[in-house]
Amino acid sequence: MFLEKIFGSVFGFGESIGIDLGTASVLVYIKGKGIVVREPSVVTIDKNTDTILAVGNEAREMIGKTPGNIVAIRPLREGVISDYETTERMLKYFIQKAVGSHPIAKPTIAVCVPSSITEVEKRAVEDATRQAGARKVLIIEEPVAAAIGAGIDIGKACGSMVVDIGGGTTDIAVISLGGTVVSTSLKVAGDNFDEAIIKHMRKKHNLLIGERSAENLKINIGTAYARTMPVSMDIRGRNLITGLPRNITVTSEEMLEALSEPVSMIADAVHGILEKTPPELAADISDRGIVMTGGGSLLYGLDKLIAERTHINTMIAEDAISCVALGTGKYIEYEERMKRIGAKRREREMNSVPSDIQEGVRSRQE
Protein backbone atom coordinates (compact mmCIF):
# COMPACT_ATOMS: atom_id res chain seq x y z
CA MET A 1 0.00 0.00 0.00
CA PHE A 2 2.96 2.34 0.44
CA LEU A 3 3.09 3.14 -3.30
CA GLU A 4 -0.66 3.12 -3.77
CA LYS A 5 -0.97 6.48 -2.07
CA ILE A 6 1.40 7.93 -4.64
CA PHE A 7 0.35 6.16 -7.82
CA GLY A 8 -3.34 6.14 -7.03
CA SER A 9 -3.46 9.91 -6.82
CA VAL A 10 -1.11 10.97 -9.60
CA PHE A 11 -1.38 8.37 -12.35
CA GLY A 12 -3.99 8.04 -15.05
CA PHE A 13 -3.05 5.69 -17.90
CA GLY A 14 -0.21 5.22 -20.37
CA GLU A 15 3.25 6.16 -19.05
CA SER A 16 6.21 3.80 -18.59
CA ILE A 17 8.65 3.70 -15.67
CA GLY A 18 11.71 1.53 -15.13
CA ILE A 19 13.21 1.03 -11.66
CA ASP A 20 16.67 -0.37 -10.96
CA LEU A 21 16.37 -1.27 -7.29
CA GLY A 22 20.00 -1.99 -6.51
CA THR A 23 21.97 -2.86 -3.40
CA ALA A 24 24.15 0.22 -3.80
CA SER A 25 21.84 2.64 -5.60
CA VAL A 26 18.35 3.23 -6.97
CA LEU A 27 17.81 4.56 -10.48
CA VAL A 28 14.43 5.56 -11.89
CA TYR A 29 13.83 5.85 -15.64
CA ILE A 30 10.80 7.58 -17.14
CA LYS A 31 10.06 7.15 -20.83
CA GLY A 32 10.82 10.32 -22.73
CA LYS A 33 12.82 11.82 -19.85
CA GLY A 34 15.56 9.27 -19.26
CA ILE A 35 17.01 8.66 -15.80
CA VAL A 36 15.45 11.14 -13.40
CA VAL A 37 16.69 9.67 -10.09
CA ARG A 38 20.15 8.29 -9.34
CA GLU A 39 20.89 8.05 -5.60
CA PRO A 40 22.43 5.62 -3.08
CA SER A 41 20.20 2.97 -1.47
CA VAL A 42 20.72 4.41 2.00
CA VAL A 43 18.29 5.65 4.67
CA THR A 44 19.09 7.25 8.04
CA ILE A 45 16.54 6.67 10.81
CA ASP A 46 16.17 7.98 14.36
CA LYS A 47 15.68 4.77 16.36
CA ASN A 48 13.96 6.60 19.21
CA THR A 49 11.15 7.99 17.05
CA ASP A 50 11.36 5.68 14.00
CA THR A 51 11.58 8.82 11.88
CA ILE A 52 13.44 8.97 8.56
CA LEU A 53 15.98 11.78 8.71
CA ALA A 54 17.53 11.46 5.27
CA VAL A 55 17.44 9.31 2.13
CA GLY A 56 19.87 8.82 -0.73
CA ASN A 57 22.79 11.20 -1.15
CA GLU A 58 22.14 13.03 2.10
CA ALA A 59 21.91 9.77 4.05
CA ARG A 60 25.10 8.45 2.49
CA GLU A 61 27.01 11.46 3.77
CA MET A 62 26.02 10.42 7.30
CA ILE A 63 27.45 6.88 7.16
CA GLY A 64 29.91 6.40 10.00
CA LYS A 65 29.20 9.85 11.44
CA THR A 66 25.89 9.39 13.29
CA PRO A 67 25.26 9.36 17.08
CA GLY A 68 24.00 6.21 18.78
CA ASN A 69 20.29 6.88 18.29
CA ILE A 70 20.64 7.48 14.54
CA VAL A 71 21.42 4.58 12.20
CA ALA A 72 22.30 4.58 8.51
CA ILE A 73 20.61 1.59 6.87
CA ARG A 74 21.18 -0.05 3.51
CA PRO A 75 17.92 -2.02 3.20
CA LEU A 76 19.05 -4.22 0.31
CA ARG A 77 21.76 -6.84 0.56
CA GLU A 78 23.13 -9.06 -2.20
CA GLY A 79 20.50 -7.84 -4.62
CA VAL A 80 17.44 -8.63 -2.49
CA ILE A 81 15.41 -6.84 0.16
CA SER A 82 16.74 -7.39 3.67
CA ASP A 83 14.63 -4.72 5.41
CA TYR A 84 11.23 -4.60 3.71
CA GLU A 85 9.70 -1.73 5.67
CA THR A 86 12.69 0.56 5.18
CA THR A 87 12.80 -0.36 1.48
CA GLU A 88 9.15 0.68 1.15
CA ARG A 89 9.81 4.04 2.74
CA MET A 90 12.91 4.59 0.61
CA LEU A 91 11.04 3.75 -2.59
CA LYS A 92 8.23 6.11 -1.66
CA TYR A 93 10.74 8.95 -1.39
CA PHE A 94 12.45 8.17 -4.71
CA ILE A 95 9.21 7.78 -6.64
CA GLN A 96 7.86 11.06 -5.29
CA LYS A 97 11.12 12.69 -6.34
CA ALA A 98 10.91 11.17 -9.83
CA VAL A 99 7.27 12.12 -10.41
CA GLY A 100 7.54 15.59 -8.87
CA SER A 101 4.52 17.83 -8.86
CA HIS A 102 3.48 16.95 -12.43
CA PRO A 103 0.90 14.13 -12.60
CA ILE A 104 1.54 11.43 -15.19
CA ALA A 105 -0.63 8.61 -16.43
CA LYS A 106 -1.06 5.32 -14.61
CA PRO A 107 2.12 3.55 -15.63
CA THR A 108 3.47 0.29 -16.82
CA ILE A 109 6.32 -0.33 -14.38
CA ALA A 110 9.32 -2.50 -15.12
CA VAL A 111 11.48 -3.60 -12.20
CA CYS A 112 14.75 -5.45 -12.61
CA VAL A 113 15.80 -8.28 -10.29
CA PRO A 114 18.89 -10.52 -10.00
CA SER A 115 18.76 -13.64 -12.16
CA SER A 116 19.03 -15.78 -9.00
CA ILE A 117 15.92 -14.33 -7.33
CA THR A 118 13.39 -16.89 -6.07
CA GLU A 119 9.80 -17.06 -7.29
CA VAL A 120 8.61 -15.91 -3.86
CA GLU A 121 10.88 -12.84 -3.94
CA LYS A 122 9.88 -12.10 -7.52
CA ARG A 123 6.17 -12.37 -6.71
CA ALA A 124 6.59 -10.03 -3.74
CA VAL A 125 8.13 -7.37 -5.99
CA GLU A 126 5.36 -7.78 -8.56
CA ASP A 127 2.53 -7.70 -6.01
CA ALA A 128 3.86 -4.61 -4.27
CA THR A 129 4.18 -2.77 -7.56
CA ARG A 130 0.73 -3.80 -8.78
CA GLN A 131 -0.91 -2.79 -5.48
CA ALA A 132 0.79 0.55 -5.92
CA GLY A 133 -1.49 1.24 -8.87
CA ALA A 134 0.61 0.08 -11.79
CA ARG A 135 -1.44 -0.69 -14.88
CA LYS A 136 1.00 -3.47 -15.71
CA VAL A 137 4.10 -4.91 -14.03
CA LEU A 138 7.10 -6.37 -15.82
CA ILE A 139 9.82 -8.23 -13.93
CA ILE A 140 13.12 -8.30 -15.81
CA GLU A 141 16.33 -10.13 -15.05
CA GLU A 142 19.25 -7.75 -14.62
CA PRO A 143 21.47 -9.23 -17.38
CA VAL A 144 18.68 -8.79 -19.95
CA ALA A 145 18.07 -5.21 -18.84
CA ALA A 146 21.82 -4.54 -18.88
CA ALA A 147 22.12 -5.91 -22.42
CA ILE A 148 19.32 -3.69 -23.70
CA GLY A 149 20.78 -0.67 -21.92
CA ALA A 150 24.18 -1.40 -23.46
CA GLY A 151 22.65 -1.25 -26.93
CA ILE A 152 22.64 -4.97 -27.68
CA ASP A 153 19.81 -6.20 -29.91
CA ILE A 154 18.72 -9.12 -27.75
CA GLY A 155 16.12 -10.25 -30.30
CA LYS A 156 18.70 -11.51 -32.78
CA ALA A 157 19.59 -15.17 -33.20
CA CYS A 158 23.09 -14.40 -32.04
CA GLY A 159 24.84 -15.03 -28.73
CA SER A 160 25.78 -12.08 -26.53
CA MET A 161 27.47 -12.28 -23.13
CA VAL A 162 26.82 -9.68 -20.46
CA VAL A 163 28.61 -9.37 -17.12
CA ASP A 164 26.71 -6.97 -14.84
CA ILE A 165 28.61 -6.13 -11.64
CA GLY A 166 26.43 -4.23 -9.22
CA GLY A 167 26.80 -3.51 -5.53
CA GLY A 168 25.50 -6.83 -4.18
CA THR A 169 25.56 -9.30 -7.05
CA THR A 170 27.37 -10.07 -10.28
CA ASP A 171 25.01 -11.42 -12.94
CA ILE A 172 26.57 -13.23 -15.89
CA ALA A 173 24.42 -14.36 -18.81
CA VAL A 174 24.47 -15.49 -22.41
CA ILE A 175 21.49 -14.03 -24.25
CA SER A 176 19.98 -14.95 -27.62
CA LEU A 177 16.56 -14.46 -29.25
CA GLY A 178 15.34 -12.27 -26.41
CA GLY A 179 16.02 -14.76 -23.62
CA THR A 180 18.70 -16.10 -21.32
CA VAL A 181 20.37 -19.28 -22.54
CA VAL A 182 22.73 -19.85 -19.60
CA SER A 183 23.39 -17.65 -16.58
CA THR A 184 24.61 -17.40 -13.02
CA SER A 185 24.32 -14.89 -10.21
CA LEU A 186 27.33 -14.48 -7.96
CA LYS A 187 27.07 -12.84 -4.54
CA VAL A 188 30.40 -11.12 -5.11
CA ALA A 189 30.35 -7.54 -6.36
CA GLY A 190 31.16 -3.93 -5.50
CA ASP A 191 30.36 -4.24 -1.79
CA ASN A 192 32.74 -7.19 -1.55
CA PHE A 193 35.49 -5.07 -3.11
CA ASP A 194 35.00 -2.55 -0.28
CA GLU A 195 34.99 -5.29 2.36
CA ALA A 196 38.20 -6.78 0.94
CA ILE A 197 39.91 -3.38 1.16
CA ILE A 198 38.77 -2.87 4.77
CA LYS A 199 40.04 -6.35 5.68
CA HIS A 200 43.39 -5.70 3.99
CA MET A 201 43.93 -2.38 5.78
CA ARG A 202 43.15 -3.98 9.13
CA LYS A 203 45.43 -6.98 8.55
CA LYS A 204 48.41 -5.23 6.95
CA HIS A 205 48.39 -1.81 8.62
CA ASN A 206 46.38 -2.35 11.83
CA LEU A 207 44.20 0.46 10.50
CA LEU A 208 40.43 0.56 10.76
CA ILE A 209 38.73 2.46 7.93
CA GLY A 210 35.05 2.95 7.12
CA GLU A 211 32.93 2.09 4.08
CA ARG A 212 33.32 5.55 2.56
CA SER A 213 37.11 5.45 2.82
CA ALA A 214 37.24 1.95 1.33
CA GLU A 215 35.03 3.04 -1.56
CA ASN A 216 37.27 6.06 -2.22
CA LEU A 217 40.31 3.78 -2.36
CA LYS A 218 38.48 1.44 -4.74
CA ILE A 219 37.42 4.23 -7.08
CA ASN A 220 40.70 6.14 -7.12
CA ILE A 221 43.44 3.50 -6.97
CA GLY A 222 41.63 0.14 -6.94
CA THR A 223 42.94 -2.31 -9.52
CA ALA A 224 42.27 -5.83 -10.72
CA TYR A 225 45.20 -5.93 -13.16
CA ALA A 226 48.73 -4.56 -12.72
CA ARG A 227 48.98 -0.90 -13.77
CA THR A 228 51.80 0.25 -16.02
CA MET A 229 52.02 3.42 -13.91
CA PRO A 230 51.31 2.71 -10.22
CA VAL A 231 49.33 5.32 -8.29
CA SER A 232 48.89 6.05 -4.59
CA MET A 233 46.52 7.80 -2.22
CA ASP A 234 46.62 9.06 1.36
CA ILE A 235 44.00 7.62 3.69
CA ARG A 236 43.09 8.24 7.32
CA GLY A 237 41.78 5.70 9.80
CA ARG A 238 42.07 4.60 13.42
CA ASN A 239 45.17 2.81 14.59
CA LEU A 240 43.95 -0.42 16.21
CA ILE A 241 46.95 -0.54 18.54
CA THR A 242 47.01 3.04 19.88
CA GLY A 243 43.36 3.88 19.20
CA LEU A 244 44.46 7.20 17.69
CA PRO A 245 43.86 8.62 14.19
CA ARG A 246 46.58 7.78 11.68
CA ASN A 247 47.39 8.74 8.09
CA ILE A 248 49.10 6.36 5.67
CA THR A 249 49.83 6.23 1.94
CA VAL A 250 48.28 3.30 0.08
CA THR A 251 49.47 2.14 -3.36
CA SER A 252 47.66 0.53 -6.27
CA GLU A 253 49.92 -2.52 -5.84
CA GLU A 254 48.36 -3.01 -2.40
CA MET A 255 44.89 -2.70 -3.91
CA LEU A 256 45.78 -5.38 -6.46
CA GLU A 257 46.68 -7.67 -3.57
CA ALA A 258 43.60 -6.73 -1.53
CA LEU A 259 41.16 -7.28 -4.40
CA SER A 260 42.71 -10.41 -5.90
CA GLU A 261 40.23 -12.85 -4.33
CA PRO A 262 36.87 -11.23 -5.28
CA VAL A 263 37.97 -10.28 -8.82
CA SER A 264 39.32 -13.80 -9.41
CA MET A 265 35.96 -15.25 -8.34
CA ILE A 266 34.20 -13.10 -10.94
CA ALA A 267 36.67 -13.98 -13.70
CA ASP A 268 36.35 -17.70 -12.86
CA ALA A 269 32.54 -17.45 -12.97
CA VAL A 270 32.69 -15.86 -16.44
CA HIS A 271 34.95 -18.69 -17.60
CA GLY A 272 32.54 -21.22 -16.10
CA ILE A 273 29.55 -19.81 -18.00
CA LEU A 274 31.51 -19.90 -21.26
CA GLU A 275 32.18 -23.60 -20.66
CA LYS A 276 28.41 -24.20 -20.41
CA THR A 277 27.56 -22.13 -23.50
CA PRO A 278 26.44 -24.00 -26.67
CA PRO A 279 29.23 -24.04 -29.30
CA GLU A 280 27.40 -21.88 -31.85
CA LEU A 281 26.69 -19.16 -29.30
CA ALA A 282 30.23 -19.41 -27.91
CA ALA A 283 31.52 -18.69 -31.41
CA ASP A 284 29.29 -15.59 -31.58
CA ILE A 285 30.66 -14.36 -28.24
CA SER A 286 34.22 -14.95 -29.41
CA ASP A 287 33.50 -12.72 -32.43
CA ARG A 288 31.44 -10.05 -30.66
CA GLY A 289 33.23 -9.94 -27.32
CA ILE A 290 32.02 -9.77 -23.71
CA VAL A 291 30.17 -6.65 -22.55
CA MET A 292 30.55 -5.45 -18.95
CA THR A 293 28.03 -3.21 -17.19
CA GLY A 294 27.36 -1.93 -13.68
CA GLY A 295 29.45 0.22 -11.36
CA GLY A 296 31.73 -2.68 -10.46
CA SER A 297 32.83 -3.02 -14.08
CA LEU A 298 34.64 0.32 -13.73
CA LEU A 299 37.26 -1.16 -11.39
CA TYR A 300 40.55 -0.58 -13.18
CA GLY A 301 41.78 -3.59 -15.13
CA LEU A 302 38.84 -5.92 -14.45
CA ASP A 303 38.04 -6.02 -18.16
CA LYS A 304 41.68 -6.87 -18.90
CA LEU A 305 41.66 -9.65 -16.29
CA ILE A 306 38.54 -11.25 -17.79
CA ALA A 307 39.95 -10.92 -21.31
CA GLU A 308 43.17 -12.61 -20.19
CA ARG A 309 41.30 -15.48 -18.50
CA THR A 310 38.85 -16.08 -21.37
CA HIS A 311 40.95 -15.05 -24.40
CA ILE A 312 37.93 -13.04 -25.57
CA ASN A 313 37.85 -9.28 -26.13
CA THR A 314 36.10 -7.68 -23.15
CA MET A 315 34.69 -4.16 -23.22
CA ILE A 316 32.97 -1.84 -20.75
CA ALA A 317 29.63 -0.48 -21.97
CA GLU A 318 29.15 3.23 -22.43
CA ASP A 319 27.55 4.69 -19.27
CA ALA A 320 27.95 1.29 -17.60
CA ILE A 321 26.38 2.44 -14.33
CA SER A 322 23.09 3.37 -16.04
CA CYS A 323 22.72 0.36 -18.36
CA VAL A 324 20.37 -1.66 -16.13
CA ALA A 325 18.05 1.29 -15.47
CA LEU A 326 18.00 2.30 -19.14
CA GLY A 327 17.36 -1.28 -20.22
CA THR A 328 14.62 -1.74 -17.63
CA GLY A 329 12.71 1.22 -19.02
CA LYS A 330 13.38 0.36 -22.66
CA TYR A 331 12.29 -3.26 -22.14
CA ILE A 332 8.72 -2.02 -22.10
CA GLU A 333 9.19 -0.61 -25.60
CA TYR A 334 10.93 -3.84 -26.66
CA GLU A 335 8.03 -5.96 -25.41
CA GLU A 336 5.51 -3.76 -27.21
CA ARG A 337 7.53 -4.09 -30.43
CA MET A 338 7.64 -7.88 -30.08
CA LYS A 339 3.86 -7.94 -29.61
CA ARG A 340 3.36 -5.85 -32.76
CA ILE A 341 5.65 -8.17 -34.73
CA GLY A 342 3.72 -11.17 -33.41
CA ALA A 343 0.39 -9.58 -34.32
CA LYS A 344 1.57 -8.84 -37.86
CA ARG A 345 2.87 -12.39 -38.23
CA ARG A 346 -0.48 -13.82 -37.10
CA GLU A 347 -2.26 -11.50 -39.52
CA ARG A 348 -0.10 -12.69 -42.43
CA GLU A 349 -0.75 -16.29 -41.45
CA MET A 350 -4.49 -15.65 -41.34
CA ASN A 351 -4.42 -13.93 -44.74
CA SER A 352 -2.86 -17.04 -46.26
CA VAL A 353 -5.72 -19.21 -44.95
CA PRO A 354 -8.93 -19.68 -47.05
CA SER A 355 -11.72 -17.31 -46.00
CA ASP A 356 -14.10 -20.04 -44.79
CA ILE A 357 -11.42 -21.40 -42.43
CA GLN A 358 -10.63 -17.85 -41.24
CA GLU A 359 -14.27 -17.41 -40.21
CA GLY A 360 -14.18 -20.67 -38.28
CA VAL A 361 -11.02 -19.61 -36.42
CA ARG A 362 -12.53 -16.21 -35.52
CA SER A 363 -15.77 -17.78 -34.28
CA ARG A 364 -13.85 -20.17 -32.02
CA GLN A 365 -11.79 -17.25 -30.65
CA GLU A 366 -15.00 -15.36 -29.89
Model-based region annotation:
Residues M1-I165, A173-V291, S297-E366:
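Nucleotide/phosphate-binding catalytic cleft detector across ATP-hydrolyzing
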